[in-house]
Each structure stands twice: as C-alpha cells, then as structure tokens.
Amino acid sequence: MNNHFGKGLMAGLKATHADSAVNVTKFCADYKRGFVLGYSHRMYEKTGDRQLSAWEAGILTRRYGLDKEMVMDFFRENNSCSTLRFFMAGYRLEN
C-alpha cells in the first residue's frame, strides 16, 4: 500500500512554489492534501507567520478541489480562531 499523503507532505515540504490546478490533476486527494499541509508548514517555518500559511493553505485547498474540513483539521490543533479565519479567507478568495 502506498502512502500518498506522506509523499505529498514530503513534496510540499520541499516545494519552492505551489503548482497550478492543471498540474496536480494526476494526483489523488490524499497526495494533494499532504502537499498543501507540507507546503503551508514550510511557509510557516520560513516566515514565522501562521496566518499567512493558513491563508495559502486555504487558497490551495480550493484550487486543488479538496475537502476543506479535512485540511482545516490541521489548523484546529493550535486552537486559534484567527488561523481558521485566515484559512477561510484564502479558501473564499480562490475562484
């Protein structure tokens, strides 16, 4: 059994930019969710701004057609309402 989430997470942690929706269509939802979380975590490590990383995760979640509740669970862990608001702001921004 392949760990698609783990592979996506590692790819996101190494990525310098996020791909367009067209470029990720070949990947399954678990891989894309892992990528979004890895990429947003890397952004947080680089900037120290949890709200910015949540905003970017919201944008990518919408862009990649992911279930927002599954991605939002990651941001609920730190019990920050503002982080969730920034996630939703990014999610609503992407059309």
From Swiss-Prot:
A biological-process GO annotation: response to butan-1-ol
Matches recorded under InterPro entries: DUF2623
Stored Pfam families: DUF2623
Descriptive protein name: Uncharacterized protein YghW
Gene: yghW
